[in-house]
Amino acid sequence: ISTGEYNKMDQWINGLIKLPFGKSVPLPVSNKDSFDKKRDYIKETLDNMNNAIYGHVEAKTHILQVIGKWIRNPDSLGNVLAIQGPMGNGKTTLIKNGIAKSLNRPFEFVALGGASDSAFFEGHSYTYEGSRWGRIVDILHKCESMNPIICFDELDKVSETAKGDEIINMLIHMTDSSQNSKFQDNYFPGIDIDLSKVLFIFSFNDESKINRILKDRMYVIRTKGYNNKDKLQIAHN
């Protein structure tokens, strides 16, 4: 066996072994905990969001309702959220420093505007020269958990890319609760990768550009831009 072939096999084996099969990060509280502990956790979550970003009261209320549902039913953790709102109003900050911090789960950010095709996420076949696994496996490696929070930014920009439909179809498959427990990376054919516990969060500006099937999977939380009074308050703080 050649050195090149050996290195290729070594990369494949190490990449597979590094996948955190069966590992996940539990919620900081459960339904079995006391009422006071659950109440304190919800208050802490609201404090995290308020410290992360000013305003967005309605959006924060929706997020607290969703987290309350997860406390009651942890098995529903594999969810698809979406934060809609104008550019520059703090959607990503709300997700990273509000939601991810409160859930205490590893967080990864993916800029969809920079994705060229679905292979960016799903990898290339092992037989190709210089092939490797895709971005999703990369994220699982880095997070060392099967239930990270993955934030896909600028979903509405995907339709403007050359292979936008291909990427959207991949996202539809990835967020389908009936089949995302059997996600496969092209680099690891025949090996099921369970994404059912991942929290997918999409952010976008223009809701009219979102694929209808994908949008039906989402719990959409709408945010507004800041008015002059809000901007003065932010500047003062």
Set out the residue ranges of the language-model regions.
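Conserved catalytic/switch belt of AAA+ P-loop NTPases
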Residues: 152-193
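Short regulatory helix/loop adjacent to the ATP-binding pocket of P-loop NTPases
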Residues: 163-164, 187-188, 192-193, 205-218
